Amino acid sequence: MQAHAAETKKVDVLLVGGGIMSSTLAVWLHELEPSWSMEMVERLDGVAEESSNGWNNAGTGHSALAELNYTPEDKDGNVNISKAIEINEAFQISRQFWSWQVRQGVLKNPHSFINTTPHMSFVWGDDNIKFLKKRYDALQASPLFRPMQYSEDHAQIAKWVPLMMEGRDPNQKLAVTWTPIGTDVNFGEITRQFVGHLQTQKGFELKLSSEVQDITRNKDGSWHVEYKNLKDGTESATDAKFLFIGAGGGALKLLQKSGIPEAKEYAGFPVGGSFLVTENPTVAMQHMAKAYGIASTGAPPMSVPHLDTRVLDGKRVILFGPFATFSTKFLKNGSYLDLLSSTTTHNVWPMTKVGIDQYPLVEYLAGQLMLSDDDRFEALRTYFPNAKKEEWRLWQAGQRVQIIKRDAEKGGVLKLGTEVVASEDRTIAGLLGASPGASTAAPIMLHVLETVFKEKVATPEWQAKIKEIVPSYGTKLNDSAAATQKEWNYTAEVLQLGKPPVIDASVEFGGAASKPVESKPENDMAL
């Protein structure tokens, strides 16, 4: 149905999806162009109920301090740290963005959404220990990673993570890195606070329980979006000069619906994740870290297990996982027909090719699906030897849609990270992919602005405002210990985080960002 012109609302910006990405973009735009009218459409009954919900996140506060898959080894055995630096720099932009929002009163009570939580890498086995030491040494070349400490001493490790050491074989060889400046972030809380603030502003409207039915282009180049209220069945329409699709797993199908040729390049493959969780306060209070392991031999790096301290719904809990799950849904609250309905004549071959080329990944997923409760509990005990089965339950987290892009040579390739897909005329943009996801929402949305509103970003007005919000904009913190220290101190104070360690100014930095190596695509698959 083409809604009658009289019923069609007109806005400058329409955002589809009420998660961390859309809300972050809306806050950016409201800062830069307060007079623009905006509408946000969300199919569920509240914002941040899909992947932005804390219980549906696979992990948070990603800043490459502990995730070993962001520092691959090259064929000569050298550890490449360029991806880790890129992700850490991006996270510092997020910290600055949130700090500004706290100062403006948009975000309230920093402890409700961000808390200091040390990040650790925790490995055993001679090869893994050797790799971790090499990784630690390589990262010391960057001021961003200077506070990291390395230890193979059981007594020291027990001081950091007593829970992981009690009941462990004293002769087991271990190696860990411990970084005190890590954080745990609740993106559901940030999203709710962002949208709550936007709702108090003139020119912003939120439509909940509203599912997009159709997206068509108007003669004047704007977008006509029709949506249905799932509660009462009423249908509405909005015309927007700019349309952003930040609908998580639902983004691919909506981009396909728009008919833009750029969307034909992509296919999506859903991967879910489940976690073991304990809410026992006695246990939770004994563990204060996000401890990342290394993928078992033969398993792809996406399977890296972690024992995570999280603050969810105001209480401290521990999550262990992820264990891969499979469903043809693209969203936790999606349809089992999602995978089939997103498959087209354009993307079926790339998907098939990736399935053939990534056979170990397929094998891994199949193996994960066959795990029993006992298998999962045994995996937990390698990290927490004294865990009691009755204190843990299995929780199904959110769905991630791994993106596959058409490739002239290979037919199709798995794509790393998140990808901004925009039309040639830059009137519509969508976000595909999953990792590192929400942790880098502020810089990813800044990238959307640079892509879509290129001319405006170049104006002195936008430049000045962006630099006010993100003081380090346009510079590389990695190049300067003084700039890194300044940014840490500023954001830690505003966000009420632990006082950052002082970087030793006598150490020379620079040249740490080795040239990126081509890492395996599954390195970045987020569960």
Curated annotation (Swiss-Prot):
The entry's keywords: FAD, Flavoprotein, Oxidoreductase, Tricarboxylic acid cycle
Record's keyword annotation contains Transferase: no
Enzyme Commission numbers on file: 1.1.5.4
GO molecular function, a single term: L-malate dehydrogenase (quinone) activity
Superkingdom classification of source: Bacteria
UniProt cross-references to SUPFAM superfamilies, sorted A to Z: FAD/NAD(P)-binding domain
Biological process annotations from GO: tricarboxylic acid cycle
Organism this protein belongs to: Pseudomonas putida (strain ATCC 47054 / DSM 6125 / CFBP 8728 / NCIMB 11950 / KT2440)
Family stated for the protein in its record: Belongs to the MQO family.
Pathway: Carbohydrate metabolism; tricarboxylic acid cycle; oxaloacetate from (S)-malate (quinone route): step 1/1
Recorded catalytic activity of this chain's protein: (S)-malate + a quinone = a quinol + oxaloacetate
Cofactor field: FAD
Protein name: Probable malate:quinone oxidoreductase 2
Pfam families membership: Mqo (PF06039)
